[in-house]
């Protein structure tokens, strides 16, 4: 008898849980899925294929420009958004939303060479150099100034 009551109780709970899940969550409230994509690392002729595949796989958004400061500002004060405009247009064509990143994790080589004071310096005197991510010090006023300018240009162009 106890076994039958337990089985009946479990069956009721299971059906309630399944019913509740179907009423609690509808598609529009579920987490969106996305992918990081670095168009600056791929030949432009491959972009459309890649965006189509993202769409076909069910991705809903992509991140751009996370590590692209050197492509956005190849020389100090000279900005190039043409390549990124093309990538955004293709993302839009395939119904992908774009999360625009600020590129501050990877300063361009010209910045590290012209302003070495922006580089992280450890207590033992070791100085990080260009060639890895996160080698600039957020404590550096010069770095913050130049990062702000780049972010401002990005915002002006896409805002």
Provide a role label for each language-model segment:
Residues 10-12, 101, 136:
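Generic recognition of cysteine residues
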Residues 17-20, 151-159:
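Short, intrinsically disordered, charge-balanced linker/junction segments flanking boundaries
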Residues 25-26, 125-126, 136:
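Short, flexible segments with low predicted structural confidence
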Residues 1-21:
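Bacterial Sec-dependent N-terminal signal peptides
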Residues 32-43, 65-84, 128-149, 155-157:
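The substrate-binding groove and active-site-proximal loops of carbohydrate-active enzymes
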Residues 48-126, 152-155:
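Aromatic-lined substrate-binding rim segments of carbohydrate-active enzymes
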Residues 22-46, 53-60:
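An acidic-aromatic substrate-binding cleft motif
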């Amino acid at each position: 008898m106890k076994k039958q009551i337990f089985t009946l109780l479990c069956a009721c709970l299971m059906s309630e849980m399944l019913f509740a899940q179907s009423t609690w969550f509808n598609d529009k409230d579920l987490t969106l899925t996305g992918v990081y994509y670095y168009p600056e690392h791929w030949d432009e002729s491959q972009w459309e294929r890649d965006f189509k595949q993202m769409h076909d796989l069910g991705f809903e958004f992509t991140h751009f420009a996370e590590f692209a400061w050197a492509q956005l500002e190849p020389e100090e004060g000279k900005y190039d958004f043409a390549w990124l405009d093309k990538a955004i247009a293709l993302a839009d064509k395939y119904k992908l939303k774009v999360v625009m990143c600020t590129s501050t994790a990877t300063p361009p080589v010209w910045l590290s060479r012209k302003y070495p004071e922006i580089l992280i310096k450890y207590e033992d005197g070791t100085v990080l150099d260009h060639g890895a991510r996160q080698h600039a010090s957020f404590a550096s006023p010069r770095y913050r100034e130049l990062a702000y300018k780049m972010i401002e240009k990005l915002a002006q162009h896409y805002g």
